[in-house]
Amino acid sequence: MGNIQMSTISIAVDAMGGDFAPEAVVGGLNFALMNLLVDHNISFNIYGKEDCVLPVLDKYKTVRDNSVFINTSDVVLANDKPSFALRKRKSSSMWCAIDSIKTGTSSGVVSCGNTGALMAISRFVLGTLPNIDRPAICTKVPSKFQDFVLLDLGANIECSANSLFQFAIMGGAFAKAVLNIPNPKVALLNVGQEEIKGTGVIREAFSLLKEVEGKINFCGYVEPKDMVDGKVDVVVTDGFCGNVVLKVSESIASTIASIFKESISESIVAKFAGLLLKPRLIKNFSKFNPKLHNGAMFLGLNGVVVKSHGNSDELAFANAVKVVVNAVIHDINAKIVHELN
């Protein structure tokens, strides 16, 4: 393996998580180093079973020269319950990668593995930031004009008003640090914009956020149909609704792309029209490719943890790596603590 300089940002990688590990993971690291992180001095602490990972590492000299491999004896499985992973998977690649943040070996971690286990182990090993009750899963979502931040995406199926309040603060800090929005517009997801709409929890969270309106750019409620119009920068909701919104959005984007491909293959004229439109369509619709927006951060933990989609290919995983690197560079947790204070 290569000699890592002290000034290098070290990222821990769970090489065993995901549907296509370790090939997509190591290939994604290579893509990230060659295309997305060329201006940064990055190294990887790669955790996994040596008989699985080392043959793949041998194919990628750039990754091999910028990484340290750590052999682990166990793997968190996709169907492991969080409680089981906490009890029985202490020797897994996921656990060891997370623990490297606690020991100071790594500055952040990325994994395609079991979401519930990743959150449970991260909370147990790293703990939460001061004044944070529950971490939230957060990502940036493409829209008509610019990306917006959406949280929670599934960590908390049910939330208290205070948790939603904390999510709003954390989401605002994330938008400032990662999206470079100086004064992000924050809104609660609801079924209408009137103050009387929504559940009791949502209305109570609304009241809490109104009390600090001068310190946070709170814009009230936003409906799902308005999220992608650039009206707000941060959309806050519970994990159930957030997960549904994200998956429906990804499904719609995929369906539209599929329908268009079928339409332009129906006749010679359609194929010719598709050929003429292709450059403009690629330019306008490529930003909605979910692979380019892969990587959800677990906000509120005492460490930078990023979840990559379980079915990530090399491109998708590379973008998740970019998320964890950016979070470390922007010192996102320090900014969250500052905002809360």
From Swiss-Prot:
Alphabetized, the UniProt keywords read:
Cytoplasm, Lipid biosynthesis, Lipid metabolism, Phospholipid biosynthesis, Phospholipid metabolism, Transferase
Its UniProt pathway annotation is: Lipid metabolism; phospholipid metabolism
Gene Ontology biological-process entries: fatty acid biosynthetic process; phospholipid biosynthetic process
Q: Where in the cell is it found?
A: Cytoplasm
**Lipid biosynthesis is among the record's keywords:** yes
Would you name any one GO CC term? cytoplasm
* Superkingdom, taxonomy of origin: Bacteria
Q: Which reaction does it catalyse?
A: a fatty acyl-[ACP] + phosphate = an acyl phosphate + holo-[ACP]
SUPFAM superfamilies given for it?
Answer: Isocitrate/Isopropylmalate dehydrogenase-like
User: For this protein, what is any one GO molecular function term?
Assistant: phosphate:acyl-[acyl carrier protein] acyltransferase activity
EC number per UniProt: 2.3.1.274
Xref: InterPro entries: FA_synthesis, Phospholipid_synth_PlsX-like
Q: What class of enzyme is it?
A: transferase
* Record-stated family: Belongs to the PlsX family.
Quaternary structure, from the entry: Homodimer. Probably interacts with PlsY.
Q: What does this protein do?
A: Catalyzes the reversible formation of acyl-phosphate (acyl-PO(4)) from acyl-[acyl-carrier-protein] (acyl-ACP). This enzyme utilizes acyl-ACP as fatty acyl donor, but not acyl-CoA.
UniProt-listed NCBIfam families: plsX (TIGR00182)
Give the protein name, as stated in the record. Phosphate acyltransferase
Q: From which organism does this entry originate? A: Ehrlichia ruminantium (strain Gardel)
According to the entry, what is the taxonomic lineage of the organism? Bacteria, Pseudomonadati, Pseudomonadota, Alphaproteobacteria, Rickettsiales
The gene for this chain is plsX
